[in-house]
Amino acid sequence: MYEATKEDSFKEFVIAQLSRMEAPEGTAERLPAQDYSAYFFALEQTGNESYRQKIEDVMKTPEWTLELMPFITAYDTKYKRKEHYNEIAAMFRDKQQFTGYDLVSLIDTIAQMSEEIYEYYRELRDLFQVIVKEKMKNLPNSSEIMEIGYSILKACNIGVLQKEKYGNFGEFVWRTIAGIDNNTCTGLKDMICAQHIIFNKQEV
């Protein structure tokens, strides 16, 4: 939400949550994998080197999963000169079926990639476009409507999908989720909200 609004309250919330989780043995294993990128945000905002250590701790994870790919890609882009892009792309390339959460991991991974290594960026971009078109066929009755909506809006915001062609689907999902119980959204509603704010700002 901070990316979308630039309101300090959201930044302070993230830092406070990470601080609350501090423990002598570390917190990498206690923070949900999809939230690991918060360590990059906290490091950039505070300069506190303890967050860099948290990042390094996560990178010691013995097994890569799709859920970890956005974090690993961010690390590879920032610190490793993009040398593992082929392995990152292979994680998605070798996937036979994609769930809604896999789609979210894919677009979040693309968002962390540099277009300088265009071969792999383009591969994942093209893969995303194929998958999302298939997922959209099940709207509006898909059980993955939250994941699809978030992925479409974010893809429009980072130039992976054309706003003119796909933006209305993202808007449709945004209108639809107003009636979904917040307790069932597991953070996705806030994620969609942030992307919707960015989407509308870019339209101005």
Residue map of PLM features:
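CBM-like carbohydrate-recognition segments
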Residues: M1-R20, P24-K54, P140-V204
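Extended ligand-binding clefts on enzyme/binding-domain cores
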Residues: E63-M69, T73-G149, L161, K165-T184, ...
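Asp-box/WD-like beta-propeller blade repeats and closely related beta-sheet repeat scaffolds
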Residues: E49-P70
